[in-house]
Regions:
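Structured inter-helical modules in multipass membrane proteins
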Residues: 86-179
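A generic, lipid-embedded transmembrane alpha helix
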Residues: 44-62
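Juxtamembrane/interfacial segments around transmembrane helices
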Residues: 63, 97-113, 237-249
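N-terminal low-complexity, intrinsically disordered segments
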Residues: 34-45
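Transmembrane signal-anchor/signal-peptide helices with a preference for the extracytoplasmic
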Residues: 57-78, 234
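Alpha-helical transmembrane anchor segments
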Residues: 2-10, 14-33, 176-252
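Short extracytoplasmic/periplasmic juxtamembrane "stem" segments immediately C-terminal to an N-terminal membrane anchor
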Residues: 76-93, 244-252
Length: 252
């Protein structure tokens, strides 16, 4: 599902719900002569319960998407802070290790910014960037270790190594945040509820002598718009809503 465009998913869902609504109307028309006020009241009560349950699941899913978006935003800021701290602590290293560490961290910043622009569906490119990132982290760490070995008083270099360790941890946390999505099973459950609700609303409308399709279409459009927002929030590095890289850009 993550390989499909969010707009395509929302449009397909809209079409299926409208189709289910029309089928529901036809079924309601078929049952119209066999229905009385009690049947219509029961159908309306069930419809209200289903809509309430749908709103609960929809709100829960939206909350999950927002939490994951906030987590990714926080991870971006934390990584930028960790890199900035390591960059400042290069001044604690003796020459020539300070210049080597500064150059390596500058390269690391550019690599991380380049990684942040790659779609998660481009697996090969992401894998290559992750390998390059790990190799550069090791190079920065080796520079710190070499500086500690060459320095008779390694306290200052120890501060730098601590910052590098936090830099690596922040990278791991951000990588983990990118992999966390709303479980696909929840989306499938939502889609089943949406389609069933559309059919039920259509059936309830079909039981009436007069009906209007406009309210049902408006409700369907609002549902699909909310689904689009949820999916967009749940998909980092693609779509309309993305985590800004201001903190990382400021390190340049």
């Amino acid at each position: 599902m993550y390989s499909l465009n969010s707009v395509v998913i929302a449009a397909m869902l809209f079409a299926v719900i409208v189709l289910a609504h029309e089928i529901g109307i036809r079924l309601g028309n078929f049952r119209l002569t066999q229905s009385d006020s009690d049947v219509k009241s029961q159908t309306s009560a069930i419809q209200g319960g289903v809509l309430g349950l749908l709103a609960l699941i929809l709100g829960f899913t939206f909350s999950m998407s927002i939490q994951r978006y906030d987590h990714r935003s926080g991870a971006e800021v934390n990584e930028a802070n960790a890199i900035g701290t390591a960059e400042l602590r290069t001044a604690l290293l003796p020459a020539p290790y300070d210049a080597q560490a500064q150059a390596a961290i500058d390269e690391y910043i550019e690599l991380r910014l380049r990684s942040s622009q790659v779609d998660l569906t481009h697996r090969d490119e992401r894998r290559a960037l992750n390998v390059a990132t790990s190799a550069l982290q090791q190079r920065i760490w080796d520079i710190g270790v070499a500086a500690a070995d060459a320095n008779p008083n390694p306290v200052k270099t120890g501060y730098f190594l601590q910052a590098v360790n936090e830099l690596i941890d922040a990278y791991g946390s951000r990588l983990d945040a990118l992999q966390r999505h709303v479980p696909p099973a929840i989306f499938y459950l939502l889609f089943v509820f949406f389609i069933s609700t559309g059919a039920l609303i259509g059936y309830s409308s079909g039981l009436g002598e007069r009906r209007s399709r406009v309210p049902a279409l408006v409700l369907t459009m609002l549902i699909c718009l909310l689904v689009f927002i949820i999916i967009d929030l749940d998909r980092p590095r693609r779509g309309v809503i993305q985590v800004r890289q201001d903190s990382m850009e400021a390190l340049r």
